[in-house]
């Protein structure tokens, strides 16, 4: 057992000052120097995967195998940005209307970035903010969830051991009230939050009041649509994985299962069998496939949601043997007969509960998928991938997968629309708010033909040496046209032929 004291306001202010001082030197380091820290952090995670994974399972209860997977994913994200950040943030020559103009869009570090992160993926949520920002030259301060303090401390130690200077990454045992102090501090230049709708509204308002950049990921109620030609066996298997991964405590879990009439009966029968096969128990035991919830309070809240849904007219189908009464377990449950006047119809269920909807056809499936305040992820299952893409285009959400639940990968943009938040993280970070975008222009003096700056653009920006000469020849076309930029509100497509 360990205890962790909250910081005082004075300590918070001192840590911000330390972070700002570190930023002055960290932002001047080369990409190679910053990449060395991220690569070493990735290597440490892999070398001591068991140590880091066991801490996750002990602290928040997830299956040990899934904890190992999270450690691996976190290492991949560190490596991904170490490898790609310099290219992502490379200056971009602008095609201007006048041939006399020589303009370039450059990225400059922002400064101190505040992260406010949840407990369900204790390392992944941190590395998603830390890796791109550290590689961009920013420094990061994070208030992690109060129920994973040891994982929060372990991540800070990881980066220190990897060579990050003191102040480059700071773990904050801060109170909710101190978040206002942090966001109001002029040295804090941006905020990244993953959390509830209410928390997001408060943080966004505070950041907006201070005219600061922010990105928000506020949960979701992802729809999994099974079309008439879907392979039922494969779709049921993916539906169980998509709904029950991480004990069902995942923002991009397949929470709403929408199935067309032609296969609905068969699907529901097989889905019930699949959930009944889950084995509740010790998350360190390899035979366990259903872990406890993160806390008894979370389990109680979810059971109350189920009860309220049934009282409002839904039918609850409990699946499998009764779960243990000792521990924060919740019985895997399918809710059916949900109508729009039932509050559960629009709610997010954070745990092993699936909402099942039967629809007449594709159009109704799309309408139902879009009838939600949320818009984080979603998926379409069909044996016709091209048609699946066309259906996916009609779904109002931030990420859509074909024949696979929403994925978490370093090279796929992560972000939602509607009340699921705004801004994207992961993948190409140029447009994710981690850097300032600055347009630099040089124009020749028409009287002399000489430029009105004393140095040519490559001399002014000596750090542009990685770019080819053709990129910078006036009038030449961009050499990086294959780079994809992801803007807030853009839907990410991810297709698989596995179904």
Predicted regions and their residues:
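Residue-level signal for inorganic ion chemistry
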Residues: 34, 56, 78, 137, ...
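Short, well-ordered beta-strand elements within core beta-sheets of diverse protein domains
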Residues: 2-7, 22-28, 114-115, 224-227, ...
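ALDH superfamily catalytic-core signature
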Residues: 163, 198-339, 402, 450
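N-terminal Rossmann-like NAD(P)+-binding subdomain of aldehyde/semialdehyde dehydrogenases
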Residues: 1-101
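A short hydrophobic/small-residue beta-strand
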Residues: 139-141, 214, 316, 399, ...
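Thiamine diphosphate
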Residues: 457, 461-499
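Conserved C-terminal structural/oligomerization subdomain of aldehyde/semialdehyde dehydrogenase
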Residues: 2-3, 188, 225, 279, ...
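Rossmann-like NAD(P) dinucleotide-binding subdomain of oxidoreductase/dehydrogenase enzymes
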Residues: 92-234, 359
């Amino acid at each position: 057992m360990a205890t962790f004291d909250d910081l005082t306001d004075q300590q918070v202010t001192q840590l911000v000052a330390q972070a700002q001082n570190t930023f002055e030197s960290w932002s001047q380091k080369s990409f190679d120097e910053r990449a060395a820290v991220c690569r070493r952090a990735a290597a440490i995670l892999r070398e001591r995967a068991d140590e880091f994974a066991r801490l996750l399972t002990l602290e928040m209860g997830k299956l040990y195998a899934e904890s190992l997977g999270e450690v691996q994913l976190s290492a991949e994200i560190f490596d991904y940005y170490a490898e790609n950040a310099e290219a992502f943030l490379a200056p971009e020559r602008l095609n201007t209307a006048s041939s006399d103009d020589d303009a370039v869009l450059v990225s400059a570090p922002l400064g101190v970035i505040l992260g406010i992160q949840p407990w369900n993926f204790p390392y992944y949520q941190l590395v998603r903010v830390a890796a791109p920002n550290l590689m961009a030259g920013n420094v990061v301060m994070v208030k992690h969830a109060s129920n994973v303090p040891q994982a929060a401390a372990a991540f800070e130690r990881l980066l220190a051991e990897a060579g990050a200077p003191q102040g480059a990454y700071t773990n904050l045992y801060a109170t909710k009230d101190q978040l206002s102090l942090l966001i109001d501090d002029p040295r804090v230049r941006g905020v990244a939050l993953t959390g509830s709708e209410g928390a997001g509204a408060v943080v966004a308002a505070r950041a907006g009041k201070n005219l600061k950049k922010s990105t928000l990921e506020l949960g979701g109620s992802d729809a999994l649509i099974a079309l008439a030609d879907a392979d039922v066996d494969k779709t049921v298997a993916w539906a169980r994985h998509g709904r029950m991964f991480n004990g069902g405590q995942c923002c991009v879990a397949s929470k709403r299962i929408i199935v067309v009439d032609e296969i609905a009966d068969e699907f529901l029968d097989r889905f019930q069998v699949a959930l009944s096969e889950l084995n509740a128990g010790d998350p360190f035991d390899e035979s366990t496939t259903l872990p406890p919830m993160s806390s008894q309070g979370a389990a109680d809240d979810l059971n109350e949601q189920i009860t309220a849904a049934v009282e409002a007219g839904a039918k609850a189908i409990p699946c499998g043997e009764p779960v243990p009464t000792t521990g924060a377990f919740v019985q895997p449950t399918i809710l059916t007969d949900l109508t729009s006047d039932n509050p559960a119809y629009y709610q997010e269920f954070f745990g092993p509960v699936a909402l099942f909807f039967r629809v007449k056809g594709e159009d109704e499936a799309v309408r139902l998928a879009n009838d939600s305040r949320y818009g984080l992820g979603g998926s379409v299952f069909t044996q016709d991938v091209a048609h699946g893409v066309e259906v996916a285009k009609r779904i109002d959400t931030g990420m859509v997968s074909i024949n696979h639940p929403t994925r978490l990968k370093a090279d796929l943009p992560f972000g939602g629309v509607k009340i699921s938040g705004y801004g994207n993280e992961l993948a190409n970070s140029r447009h994710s708010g981690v850097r300032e975008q600055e347009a630099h222009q040089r124009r020749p003096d028409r009287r002399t033909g000489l430029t009105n700056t004393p140095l040519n653009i490559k001399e002014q920006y000596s750090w542009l040496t990685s770019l080819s000469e053709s990129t910078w020849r006036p009038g030449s076309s961009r050499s990086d046209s294959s780079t994809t930029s992801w803007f807030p509100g853009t839907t990410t497509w991810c297709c698989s032929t596995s179904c």
